[in-house]
Each structure stands twice: as C-alpha cells, then as structure tokens.
C-alpha cells in the first residue's frame, strides 16, 4: 500500500492544542483502518521565528513540497508584533501558498443542524446550508502591478492597486470549480463585475468558454458579485459552488461563513495545479479561525475547525470520501448530543474543553467506522 504523506504545522496560539486532537484521529486511521498515513512535523509562524529567525525554514518548506498534503494550524500573536515585516508570522503562510503554487482557495459554509439557532438569519433560510466558495488566490488586485502610493506634489497623494487576470488563471480556477461541482450538486455560479470591470468581462468570457469546451455537463450561471452578496443573505441555499476572483472571494467567503453563525468552526483548503503524472494537487488545509493567543494554553479552544480541515484533506487530497463523510458526521453528531466548547456553549448544553471535544468526536467517528 502506498503511503500517504502528511506534514503537520501546528503553528502558534491554539494551533498546537487543536492539532493534538487531529493527531488522535490520524492515529486511529492508521491503527484501525490501516490507511498508512506518514506524518512529519515542522514549525511555522512565530515559533519558527523564535527557532530560526524566519517564519518558516527552508528545511520545513522542503517538507511541505515533498508531502502529499499539509495541515496548518494558526500563526501570530502579540509576542511577534514588533518583528520585521518580512519575517512576521503570517509570512510563513504566504510563503507556503507561494512556493506550493496554491491558487484555488476552498471555503465551505456549512450549517450544522444543532447550531442553526446561532445564525442571525431565520432557521428556514439557513438550516441544511452546504455551499462552497472557490476563490482564486494568487492573482487579481492583491498582486497586480503597479501597487503604490504616489505623492502628487500638491499636498495630495494617489493610491494605486491594479486588478489583473490572464486567461490561463481564469481557466485553471474554472476547471477546479467544475470538478468540485461534479462531486456535489453539479452547479457553479460564477461571480464578477463585468458591468464595470474589464477583468470581469474577461473572467466571464473565460469561464463560459471553459464550460463549453470541457464541462458542459455541469450547470453554469453568472451573477454580478454585488447581487451575489445580496442573494447569499436572501436565500443562500440556491448556491452550490460559487466561483469568483481574489477580491470578491475574500469578501463573499467571510459573508458566507458568518451565515452559519460559527465562523470559528469552519475549515478551508488551498489547492495547486494537478500533477501531470499522478493527477494529484499540492494542498494545504487550515481552520478559518486565527491563533487566539488570549485563550492559548488554557485547554478551552474549539478543535472542530481543525478536525474538519482533516476531513477536507481526506476528501480532496486522498479520495477517502467515505472516511471524510463519517468524520464530518461525527462532528455533527457530537453537536447534536449537546457537547460544546466555551465559544459555542449555551444554556442546556454540556461545556467541555479542547481534549474532551476531540475525544468525543473521535469516539463518534470510531462508532461510525465500526
């Protein structure tokens, strides 16, 4: 049996505590299900700066490039607020994305039935929500040149950011969207601002052409991004996969995540190009939440987003769909049982710590895997 190579990068703050619960699940996948995961560990973020003077070492970057997949915790904290900009903790994540050439960011928005009341929307609008926002991660206005502030010499300044997309960038992210839709409900909604932006016109043309050329079996609709934001709040369950650029994806994915009322419980994935020989994509999985230094080391952090990130990893990097389904069902089942960490606790539920939540999910996963 071929081994499955995983690099674990716990990072800073609550990252190590959450990753400890993931290790338990991986141990079970190996010992009881014989799935052959090989794990290595490395440093990223502030802890890497403390050890090496940089946010990720070249050696750990090599481990990331050699792995089938990377599981990332969280980085940052006030301890490193004054370090030089180029070695700040967040630079470790940026280097991982850049060197691994991760251009497709997947942000699911899932409403767990037991937490439907946590949303600011009516339960009938949000209950059963399961959508996926696919954001182009390496192009667009965040990376386009020129990017500068110019002194106009008359007491005025001008800030310049440039939105740039090439056809190949649009085509490759569109391919990912259609591939993902086939594994879900077979629908892609592409969002841009073609009415006022030339890059939006090209985006629309590129997605349409790619659909006609390679993916005509998938339903495709186009929507202006501002209208898409409105529809996300009005009736989010109309969507399956939302495909959009870097800027709009940044905005819309946070809107979609908060629909669920549980931003800190959601996972994400960043994927790269498919290998020409194996078809596998480089991938990094991480919780949406930050490092939460204020609660680090207290044993009260919620590990659900980190465990859900492992479920995404099983699904998208290793094709272990049944195992991913069971792990996600285990999370939902524990929530149905009223087990809560402090961040999602309410009257009438059972408050537990990080370890207890991880143990409960693992026990449920074991029962579902029997």
UniProtKB/Swiss-Prot annotation:
The pathway entry for this protein reads as: Amino-acid biosynthesis; L-leucine biosynthesis; L-leucine from 3-methyl-2-oxobutanoate: step 3/4
The cofactor named in the record is: Mg(2+); Mn(2+)
The free-text cofactor remark is:
Binds 1 Mg(2+) or Mn(2+) ion per subunit.
- PROSITE patterns attached here? IDH_IMDH
Share an example GO biological-process annotation for this protein.
L-leucine biosynthetic process
Which InterPro entries does the UniProt entry name for this protein? IsoCit/isopropylmalate_DH_CS (IPR019818), IsoPropMal-DH-like_dom (IPR024084), Isopropylmalate_DH (IPR004429)
**Annotated positions binding substrate:** 97, 107, 135, 226
- Record's subcellular location: Cytoplasm
The record lists NAD(+) as bound by 77-90, 290-302
- Per the record, what are the reactions this protein catalyses? (2R,3S)-3-isopropylmalate + NAD(+) = 4-methyl-2-oxopentanoate + CO2 + NADH
Q: Where is this site: Important for catalysis?
A: 142, 193
Which GO-annotated molecular functions does the record name?
3-isopropylmalate dehydrogenase activity; magnesium ion binding; NAD binding
Tell me where it mainly resides: cytoplasm
Q: Which UniProt keywords apply?
A: Amino-acid biosynthesis, Branched-chain amino acid biosynthesis, Cytoplasm, Leucine biosynthesis, Magnesium, Manganese, Metal-binding, NAD, Oxidoreductase
Among the Pfam families in the record, one is Iso_dh
- Binding, Mg(2+): 226, 250, 254
What top-level class of enzyme does the UniProt entry assign? oxidoreductase
Instruction: Report the EC number(s), separated by commas if there are several.
Output: 1.1.1.85
> Gene3D superfamilies in the record, alphabetically?
Isopropylmalate Dehydrogenase
A GO CC term assigned to this protein in UniProt: cytosol
Ranges annotated as spanning the membrane: none
Write out the similarity annotation.
Belongs to the isocitrate and isopropylmalate dehydrogenases family. LeuB type 1 subfamily.
**Subunit and partners:** Homodimer.
What is the purpose of this protein?
Answer: Catalyzes the oxidation of 3-carboxy-2-hydroxy-4-methylpentanoate (3-isopropylmalate) to 3-carboxy-4-methyl-2-oxopentanoate. The product decarboxylates to 4-methyl-2 oxopentanoate.
From the Swiss-Prot or TrEMBL record, give the protein name: 3-isopropylmalate dehydrogenase
């Amino acid at each position: 049996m071929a081994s499955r190579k995983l690099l674990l990068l716990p990072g800073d703050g609550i990252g190590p505590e959450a990753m400890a619960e993931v290790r338990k699940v991986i141990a079970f996948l190996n010992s009881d299900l014989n799935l052959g995961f090989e794990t290595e560990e490395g440093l990223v973020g502030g802890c890497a700066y403390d050890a090496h003077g940089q946010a990720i070492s070249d050696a750990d970057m090599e481990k990331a490039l050699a792995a089938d997949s990377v599981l990332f915790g969280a980085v940052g904290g006030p301890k490193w607020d004054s370090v030089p900009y180029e070695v700040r903790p967040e630079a470790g994540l940026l280097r991982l994305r850049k060197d691994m050439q991760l251009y497709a960011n997947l942000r699911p928005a899932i409403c767990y039935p037991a937490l439907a009341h946590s949303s600011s929307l009516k339960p009938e609008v949000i209950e059963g929500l399961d959508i996926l926002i696919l954001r182009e991660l390496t192009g667009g206005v965040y990376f386009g040149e020129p990017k500068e502030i110019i002194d106009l010499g008359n007491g005025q300044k001008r800030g310049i950011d440039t939105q740039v997309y090439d056809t190949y960038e649009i085509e490759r992210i569109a391919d990912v969207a259609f591939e993902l839709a086939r594994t879900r409900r077979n629908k892609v909604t592409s969002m841009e601002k073609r009415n006022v932006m030339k890059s939006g016109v090209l985006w629309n043309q590129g997605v349409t052409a790619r659909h006609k050329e390679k993916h005509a079996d998938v339903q495709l609709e186009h929507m202006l991004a501002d209208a898409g934001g409105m529809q996300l709040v009005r009736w989010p369950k109309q969507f399956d996969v939302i495909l959009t650029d870097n800027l709009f994806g940044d905005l819309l994915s946070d809107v979609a995540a908060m629909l669920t009322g549980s931003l800190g419980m959601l996972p994400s994935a960043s994927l790269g190009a498919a290998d020409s020989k194996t078809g596998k994509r480089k991938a990094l999985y991480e919780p949406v939440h930050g490092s939460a230094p204020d609660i680090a080391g207290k044993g009260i952090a919620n590990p659900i987003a980190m465990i859900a990130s492992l479920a995404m990893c099983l699904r998208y990097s290793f094709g272990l769909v049944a195992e991913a389904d069971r792990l996600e069902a285990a999370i939902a089942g524990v929530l149905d049982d009223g087990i809560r960490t402090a961040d999602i606790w309410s009257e009438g539920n059972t408050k537990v710590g990080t370890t207890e939540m991880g143990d409960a999910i693992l026990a449920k996963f074991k029962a579902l895997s029997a």
